[in-house]
Amino acid sequence: MKLENKIALITGAGSGIGKAIALEMGSAGAHIAVNDLTAETAETTAHQIEDLGREALVIPADVADSEQVENMVQQTLNCFGRIDILVNNAGVYIPQDGGVTAITDEAWQRILDVNLNGPFYSSRAVVKDMIARKQGGKIINISSVQAEVAHFDASAYQPSKAAVVMLTRTLAVELAPYKINVNAIGPGAIASEGMGASLGPEVIEAYRKRIPWGARGYTRDIGTVAAFLASEDAGYITGQIIYVDGGYLSDSTPTELKSQDHPVPPDDPDSK
């Protein structure tokens, strides 16, 4: 297995994309430190990791809190002795109907705290161990296609994800001498509970019509890319943003000119 006995710390792994990444890496042989806001959500993923014959550690923590992040990393080191892979997946989207004038200071700060500060805090804490061990490492950040395109009512979320892109590139340059690969994945429209809850069916359908592939992706589509980036097969890849979006960012065809004959796939069973 490509990740046999590797140790991965994955934030926001209790559901959705984070859970899919954890299961994919577990299937590839890794042992997983499963972080989420609450132990209850993380435990569901941990049990599935253990069913794969791998070890799992549940660590509830808010990645927006630097002290909690330091404790999370230390707990992982205490349990497994090292961290080979960090996946900064935890994120938050707060709907802001009304645009920039409607978003509150609290919502703005929360989005930046989780989506940007969280990956920074986690990377800073993990990198100390990676550098000290002199064995390299892998950091994978989860950004979004919304780092590249703008639309209404996302004046906090989109800047936060764009900042993750530059954080990825900066860390890749800084950490290359230590053979620490830093890359990001930018999901497009993914069939997950989180997306359904935050956007609603009408908005999701509108996005689907914009996708050249004709369908939303599944959470496991992100999981497989993350597992590849965490493997030695991706050893010379660093500072890159891999968009997994069914061609969304490449297409400028007006929606009115698109064929609507694509079949609609069922909801992703792995996102539950």
Regions found by a protein language model. Name each.
Residues 2, 80, 181, 216-244, ...:
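C-terminal substrate-recognition "lid" of short-chain dehydrogenase/reductases
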